[in-house]
Curated annotation (Swiss-Prot):
Annotated domain remarks: Consists of 3 domains; the N-terminus binds the ribosome, the middle domain has PPIase activity, while the C-terminus has intrinsic chaperone activity on its own.
Species in which this protein is naturally found: Rhodococcus jostii (strain RHA1)
Region (Disordered): 435-464
Function: Involved in protein export. Acts as a chaperone by maintaining the newly synthesized protein in an open conformation. Functions as a peptidyl-prolyl cis-trans isomerase.
Protein name: Trigger factor
HAMAP family: Trigger_factor_Tig (MF_00303)
Length: 464
């Protein structure tokens, strides 16, 4: 087999492949074997009919078609490997010549990873906010802890912000009841915004046993995107009573004997959180600087695939009705044109980030150990409230294990850049990135390189 590569653009190539027919003998044998199992010829046991008789039955053209279709994927992969083509996504294959018994020729156009010129990381510099631990932040943590140990007590008054209520909900659209928007005995914290839009404002001032109507836009179901009249009936009203802020509470809620000891521990926790936040800010600013200074040609097909994925996600909860999406966007004060523009910009940034960090990882020979991959998987399983075995099975079935690997590798690549960059806070003090990121590796999920909200398009395309 012979192959040559033409560079069509920085992100696309055409591979020209010539395959002599003698190299297709295994493919012909496979095709005849499959036909022998499918076709019964008098005088021959199943699977034993001669190739010439099988060919006479189905025609030479049908055999050639089967052989070529079976041979193309493996010959394409062989050409990609032999030419060290860094292909992304599915190729567009065109058969250009078939000389029966002599030669098969085809071309394959495919997107590729572009060549990227990387900067001197030591010349990068960013400025971030300093770590500040205020008394107010400690008091917020203490209040949160007291709320966890609070008790709910029924009250004989109208609903106020922060109360806990039980409610019944029903809704109509154009006078017709909406069954999927009907519920009874729901528990809700007023002001949390966890249920339907407009509910928190509607229930304030309502007493137990009373009802109130308000309007809200439905976001799912057959009436998604439509304005509904919602009726809420308040069943019970409870307020949360907080324990006193004293030594007794410290002993109840922690391992400490005094409130001062508990506050000291909370201050240390706030400090750890602030360090993680600063690490995230450093990561984001270094990445932003890289994206601004490094030119990365973008493969159009990969960007389009990510835009299409964003649209698919947006209409998934709307029964894939794009008109419903357009109406919903209009009600939200935006438009489909703005949505498409934002989706394209987001896709371009996501693809550029992935390609850039992959190039940095390649140049730095970044590797990922099994323990690092396992640590990330365990973290994500915990994050989604799943057993590790269940999470692993799910990502394997979805073909996303490679994406997790790539995400860890990109995180390590970016951490290596951060280690070489100059980082100061707004007061002018140098920031010790080694303390936050370790020896060139991100040690926390927050210090990882890529936003998991964005799909890992280049990795998923590589696997196709």
């Amino acid at each position: 087999m012979k192959s040559t590569v033409e560079q069509l653009s920085p992100t696309r190539v055409r591979i020209n492949v010539e395959v002599p027919f003698e190299e297709l003998k295994p493919d012909f044998d496979k095709a005849y074997k499959a036909l022998a199992q499918q076709i019964r010829l008098p005088g021959f046991r199943p699977g034993k009919a001669p190739a010439k008789l099988l060919e006479a039955r189905v025609g030479r053209g049908a055999v050639l078609e089967q052989v070529v279709n079976d041979a193309l994927p493996s010959r394409y992969s062989e050409a990609v490997t032999s030419a060290s083509v860094k292909a992304i996504g599915q190729p567009e294959i065109e058969i250009t010549k078939i000389e029966d018994g002599e030669l098969l020729e085809f071309t394959a156009e495919v997107d590729v990873r572009p060549e990227i010129t990387l900067p001197d990381y030591s010349e990068l510099s960013v400025t971030v906010d300093p770590i500040e631990i205020t008394d107010e932040a400690v008091e917020e943590q203490l209040l949160s802890l007291r709320q966890r140990f609070g008790t709910l007590t029924g009250v004989e008054r109208a609903v106020e912000d922060g109360d806990f209520i039980s409610i019944d909900l029903s809704a109509t659209v154009d006078g017709e009841a909406v069954p999927e928007a009907t519920a009874s005995g729901l528990s809700h914290e007023v002001g949390s915004g966890q249920l339907i839009e407009g509910l928190d404002e509607a229930v304030v001032g309502v007493k137990a046993g009373e009802s109130k109507e308000f309007t809200s836009t439905l976001v799912a179901g057959d009436h998604a995107g439509k304005e509904a009249v919602v009726t809420v009936t308040v069943g019970t009203v409870k307020e949360r009573e907080l324990p006193a802020e004293d030594d007794e509470f410290a002993q109840l809620a922690s391992e400490f004997d005094t409130l001062d000891e508990l506050k000291a521990d909370l201050r240390e926790r706030v400090a750890r959180v602030r360090k993680v936040e600063q690490a995230g800010q450093i990561r984001d600013k270094v990445l932003e600087t890289l994206l601004e200074t490094v030119e990365v040609p973008l493969p159009e097909a990969v960007v389009k695939a990510e835009v299409d994925a964003a649209l698919h996600d947006a209409v998934h909860g709307l029964d894939h009705d794009e008109e419903a999406l357009n109406k919903l966007l209009e009600e939200q004060g935006t438009s489909r044109e703005e949505f498409d523009k934002d989706a394209k910009e987001s896709a371009e940034r996501s693809v550029k980030t992935q390609l850039l960090l992959d190039a940095i990882a390649d140049a730095s020979d970044v590797t990922v150990g099994q323990d690092e991959l396992t640590e990330r998987i365990l973290f994500q399983a915990q994050r989604y409230g799943m057993a590790p075995e269940q999470f692993i099975q799910q990502i394997q079935q979805a073909g996303q294990l490679g994406a997790v690997f790539a995400d860890v590798r990109r995180g390590k690549a970016l951490a290596g850049v951060v280690e070489q960059a100059t980082v100061t806070d707004t007061s002018g003090a140098a920031v010790d990135t080694a303390e936050l990121f370790g020896n060139g590796e991100a040690e926390t999920e927050e210090a990882a390189s890529t936003d998991e909200a964005a799909s890992d398009s280049t990795e998923s395309e590589d696997q196709k």
